[in-house]
């Protein structure tokens, strides 16, 4: 209903669904808990704000609005294995367990997270977490927060992500009429409301409880743990969590004074009630950088990829959004210092020469910005790199779906912008009849556009030009829709195979339970062999489907998130 009808209040959802208040409320609790629905209060005076609700005591309150978070839904359904593997490779298995627990439960307080992760590590003594395991969990949690892999769950005072990402809108022109000035004032007021909410959230988004930060620093200073070159960020004290203490009215019960009395996990200073969740934006940023490095390695070699990887890693903390078109400008000395810290043996002259070669390359993957106090500065054109990858992905899809001749026509139209049918047939060296069939197949699936330019008012075919062209933006959206459709089919097929495997296991258990005689043992043995073969076949099918789903998710991320 939220996908079809858009943002709705609780009362509107109850009326649309035909269900009672209690079932709708429980469903929203689960969806908000897992981040698939965002609950917030629209700005006063906003055009889409619902009317205030009057309570029985006569007071008037602003209603909450519920919206679907489609990107986070796709991340939770498709990208969970990739995220867990990334976390395990960079920070170890304990970090993987923490993120896995957060994905299972959506959002948790520190005390709840500790109670859920400790049993997975096999370290519980009478229902309590040992001190050594608690220290390890503290360290890993701080490392995750400093790496921005986890974040505080947004409150109801926080606008939705699609509003937070673009808080500043252009103001009205100076020569506007009185009416337009009034509209502009209202729009500015709404923008300021959303911007203030986003600013409050960004200030505390990765803020750790002061007690936890101090405890981990003490453990590192005492030499009880190996920090593995992790940089602990000193957070300024005195920052509050907003008027609502970091909790939304739709969240589950937060921490209390009695929760996790050991250490600072259960401290009653207000921080124990803050809930945490996985920050998919940071993982998407890492995957985006890895995709850029992969393309540079394929086109220009390992040394160029090493330099680009160092530039992206050094400027990552300065990026304000995931889809930045250019990286932060870095001088040759800055890039060289980053490479030295990562253990590279490249000299300063080699780094400078590699950057010059990248700047002179026709692909323009790196651009010269200018002179800085540290020398000549360069930046990585991430937008251009990813556009090139998207084009190659679309071309691969056209070739697989329509054949090599269709790919030849698609590339020709992309290079020449617009051509007539006869020109396409001549340049592509394809018969006219076959060219027409391929063009109309591509047109039917929205991979090309046909534009009619008439020289007369009667639009007679003999006096009309029919121009074929490729709109890369439209094709990219169409291809992404096809990928989402394929991903949905793979998920449904995977669920079907898993249910089939459960039925095979149930049948095998029933056959074992019915074994009651020596004569029947042979029959049961044959049945078990059949069930074993069916189960192995199901395992191979599930492995193939998971591999295909992983590849499909990589392509979806390229078009939807990068």
Describe the predicted segments one by one.
Residues 4-17, 105-130, 307-308, 317-345, ...:
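Short acidic, hydrophobic short linear motifs in intrinsically disordered regions
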Residues 32-45, 138, 142-158, 250, ...:
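A short, conserved structural fragment
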Residues 1-47, 63-65, 537-540, 544-550, ...:
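Eukaryote-specific detector of the first structured module of a protein
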Residues 1-2, 95-102, 304-311, 406-413:
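Hydrophobic residues on short alpha-helical segments
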Residues 27, 140, 307, 354, ...:
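Residues in the recognition helix of alpha-helical DNA-binding motifs
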Residues 52-100, 158-243, 249-256, 260-295, ...:
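Short, amphipathic alpha-helical interaction segments positioned at domain boundaries
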Residues 24, 28, 134-137, 348-351, ...:
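Helix-turn-helix DNA-binding helix
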Residues 445, 489-562:
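Long low-complexity, intrinsically disordered regions
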């Amino acid at each position: 209903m939220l996908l079809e009808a858009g943002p709705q209040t609780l009362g509107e959802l109850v009326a649309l669904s035909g269900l009672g208040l209690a079932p709708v409320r429980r469903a929203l609790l689960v969806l908000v808990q897992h981040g698939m629905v965002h609950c917030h209060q629209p700005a006063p005076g906003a055009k889409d704000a619902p009317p205030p609700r009057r309570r029985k005591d006569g007071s008037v309150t602003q209603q909450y609005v519920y919206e679907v978070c489609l990107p986070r839904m796709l991340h939770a359904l498709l990208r969970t294995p990739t995220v867990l593997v990334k976390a395990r490779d960079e920070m170890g298995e304990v970090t993987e367990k923490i993120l896995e627990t957060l994905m299972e439960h959506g959002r948790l307080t520190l005390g709840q997270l500790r109670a859920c992760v400790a049993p997975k590590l096999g370290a519980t003594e009478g229902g309590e977490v040992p001190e050594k395991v608690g220290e390890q969990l503290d360290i890993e949690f701080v490392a995750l927060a400093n790496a921005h892999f986890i974040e505080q769950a947004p409150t109801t005072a926080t606008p939705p992500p699609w509003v937070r990402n673009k808080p500043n809108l252009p103001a009205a022109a100076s020569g506007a009429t009185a009416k337009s000035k009034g509209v502009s004032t209202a729009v500015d007021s709404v923008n300021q409301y959303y911007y203030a909410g986003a600013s409050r959230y960004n200030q505390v988004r990765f803020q750790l409880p002061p007690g936890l930060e101090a405890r981990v620093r003490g453990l590192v200073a005492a030499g009880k743990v190996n920090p593995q070159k992790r940089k602990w960020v000193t957070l300024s004290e005195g920052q509050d969590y907003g008027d609502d203490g970091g909790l939304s009215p739709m969240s589950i019960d937060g921490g209390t004074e009695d929760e996790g009395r050991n250490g600072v996990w259960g401290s009653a200073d207000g921080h124990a009630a803050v809930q945490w969740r996985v920050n998919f934006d940071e993982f998407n940023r890492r995957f985006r950088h890895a995709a850029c490095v992969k393309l540079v390695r394929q086109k220009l070699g390992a040394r160029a990829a090493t330099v680009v990887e160092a530039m992206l890693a050094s400027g990552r903390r300065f990026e304000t959004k995931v889809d930045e078109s250019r990286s932060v400008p870095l001088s040759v000395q800055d890039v060289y210092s980053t490479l030295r810290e990562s253990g590279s043996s490249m000299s300063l002259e080699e780094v400078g020469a590699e950057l010059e070669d990248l700047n002179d390359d026709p692909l323009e993957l790196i651009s010269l910005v200018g002179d800085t106090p540290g020398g000549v500065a360069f930046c990585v054109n991430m937008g251009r790199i990813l556009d090139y990858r998207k084009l190659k992905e679309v071309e691969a899809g056209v070739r697989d779906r329509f054949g090599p001749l269709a790919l030849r026509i698609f590339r020709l139209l992309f290079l020449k912008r617009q051509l007539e049918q006869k020109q396409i047939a001549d340049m592509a060296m394809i018969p006219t009849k076959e060219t027409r069939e391929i063009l109309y197949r591509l047109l039917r699936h929205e991979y090309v556009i046909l534009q009619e330019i008439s020289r007369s008012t009667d639009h007679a075919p003999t006096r009309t030009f029919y121009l074929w062209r490729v709109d890369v933006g439209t094709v990219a959206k169409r291809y992404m829709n096809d990928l989402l459709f394929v991903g949905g089919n793979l998920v449904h097929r995977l669920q079907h195979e898993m249910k089939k495997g459960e039925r095979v296991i149930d049948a095998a258990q029933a056959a074992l339970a019915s074994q009651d005689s020596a004569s029947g043992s042979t029959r049961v043995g044959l049945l078990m062999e059949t069930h074993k073969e069916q189960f192995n076949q199901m395992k191979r099918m599930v492995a193939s489907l998971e591999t295909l789903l992983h590849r499909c998710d990589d392509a979806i991320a390229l078009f939807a998130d990068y």
